[in-house]
């Protein structure tokens, strides 16, 4: 419940001895009939501060272009639009830049084809997506587990709403795991990237009663 206040539709899934509890602010994919949309997030500041700067804008634009390209693979030509671009929103205890990219699916596109074209979400891979995924697999020492995937509801008629599993806790074997991170580009400042990760983590850790300052040392 403490996490749900960050997003009313925060997804939760549990099984025998494990659970995934998400406070994700990011809509990975929504489908209603043949209308499909995604709302990528890039650019983060502490709550109350403005997100500004060339790096954030360039990174966000890159991801919007990637999402447009992904949706264009399964949508009617010319139907993909981005009616909302780099809007500033207060989400999950921080301030983000959010865009909305949407289109109209081609006749006959099913769930498998839609997910194959769009998964994983571009905001957690970077671009070009396939090359970035290969580099992530080479560089990261452990798997991401439940993090950076998608979780939500798929209905019998094909409609769906999936959150990107960022700001997500995984509980198993008596331990709780939370993954946070950020996009790294050529001119990234390592210290700033670490601080951005803590900016994302602090509200969630505080919500569940974790000793935030101890963990940050």
Give, region by region, the residue ranges found by the protein language model.
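Extended alpha-helical targeting/anchoring segments
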Residues: 1-217
